[in-house]
């Protein structure tokens, strides 16, 4: 069985840069093994939203912590970024913080790419997925430290080299919401990323089997693939506060089509605020009893996930981290 790891999701859409760094430092003190950050150019919400640059945050946190593994969850290396530049950035961080950096990638959302200059109709999944696969291949070639000529359908390199690369390159974690990309994660990823709250069948019968299938097809051991899940959890001894804290993150309860196609945070906020709190809370483990919270989290471990990254929705993250250290962390460690 893969090693159980506990992580903290730094909510870049909710907190300003300095606060987000301090929260990661506190997360290490609370016993977290990792800290991940999203890479949004625009937040899910216009009012009260934030969108600090993920790579600057990772470097700042790297300087302030000793053991936290840091990564994106997730970054899209295919539209507003050139994947060669992302490869260079992560190689530099890998040299600065050896063994503590990974690159989590996904196929992208219009919210972040249209505003930054993508021209034309937002691509369908087929093209976005093809771009992702090509970008990962390109970055891995650059991390070998050799001169690279790359002639892809979307990206090209001519005599390109990254001069400072960490030994072994950078682990790539691939985010998937369905079996097609999950199979690719098993075939080509060092890790796999998904999010909680979507029903047992998705994880137990689709995603994890697809990761294993992809690994087996590539002649790999599926147990070597870190299986990460963002656990949406609103835990507080005050049950009313635990429920109300989910409100800020109402956009997560929109349909996948809305989340991938709406390109304006103002419109995203309008659509999300039209949802009743009961629907918003369905995506979350809402609990005021620590045993109940850990029992619900434990289901994901039995379904095959081993790296649990906790995303708490409330504005008082210090309170959550204190409660995590006192109430949840000792119980969670027993799941391993």
From Swiss-Prot:
Belongs to the F420-dependent glucose-6-phosphate dehydrogenase family. It comes from Mycolicibacterium fortuitum (Mycobacterium fortuitum). Catalyzes the coenzyme F420-dependent oxidation of glucose 6-phosphate (G6P) to 6-phosphogluconolactone. Appears to have a role in resistance to oxidative stress, via its consumption of G6P that serves as a source of reducing power to combat oxidative stress in mycobacteria. The keyword Membrane does not apply. This is F420-dependent glucose-6-phosphate dehydrogenase. The lineage of its organism: Bacteria, Bacillati, Actinomycetota, Actinomycetes, Mycobacteriales. Keywords: Carbohydrate metabolism, Oxidoreductase. The keyword Oxidoreductase applies. Coiled coil: none annotated.
């Amino acid at each position: 069985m893969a090693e159980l790891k506990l992580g903290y999701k730094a909510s870049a859409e909710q907190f300003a840069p300095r606060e987000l760094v301090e929260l990661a430092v506190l997360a290490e003190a609370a016993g977290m093994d990792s800290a991940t950050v999203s890479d949004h150019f625009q937040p899910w919400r216009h009012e009260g939203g934030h969108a600090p640059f993920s790579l600057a945050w990772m470097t700042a946190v790297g300087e302030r912590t000793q053991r936290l593994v840091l990564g994106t969850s997730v970054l899209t290396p295919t539209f507003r970024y050139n994947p060669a530049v992302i490869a260079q950035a992560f190689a530099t961080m890998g040299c600065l913080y050896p063994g503590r950096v990974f690159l989590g990638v996904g196929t992208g959302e219009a919210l972040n790419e249209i505003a930054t200059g993508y021209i034309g109709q937002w691509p369908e999944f087929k093209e976005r997925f093809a771009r992702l696969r090509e970008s990962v291949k390109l970055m891995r070639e650059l991390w070998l430290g050799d001169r690279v000529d790359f002639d892809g359908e979307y990206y090209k390199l001519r005599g390109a080299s990254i001069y400072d690369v960490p030994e072994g390159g950078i682990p790539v974690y691939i985010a998937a919401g369905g079996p097609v990309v999950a199979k690719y994660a098993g075939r080509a990823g060092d890790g796999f990323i998904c999010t909680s709250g979507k029903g047992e069948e998705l994880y137990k019968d689709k995603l994890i089997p697809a990761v294993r299938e992809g690994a087996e097809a590539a002649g790999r051991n599926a147990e070597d693939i870190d299986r990460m899940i963002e656990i949406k959890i609103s835990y507080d001894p005050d049950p009313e506060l635990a429920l109300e804290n989910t409100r800020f993150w109402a956009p997560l309860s929109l349909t996948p089509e809305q989340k991938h196609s709406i390109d304006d945070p103002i419109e995203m906020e309008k659509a999300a605020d039209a949802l009743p709190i009961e629907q918003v809370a369905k995506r979350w483990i809402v609990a005021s009893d620590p045993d109940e919270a850990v029992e619900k989290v434990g289901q994901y471990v039995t379904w095959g996930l081993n790296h649990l990254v906790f995303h708490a929705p409330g504005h008082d993250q210090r309170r959550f981290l204190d409660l995590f250290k006192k109430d949840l962390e000792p119980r969670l460690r027993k799941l391993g």
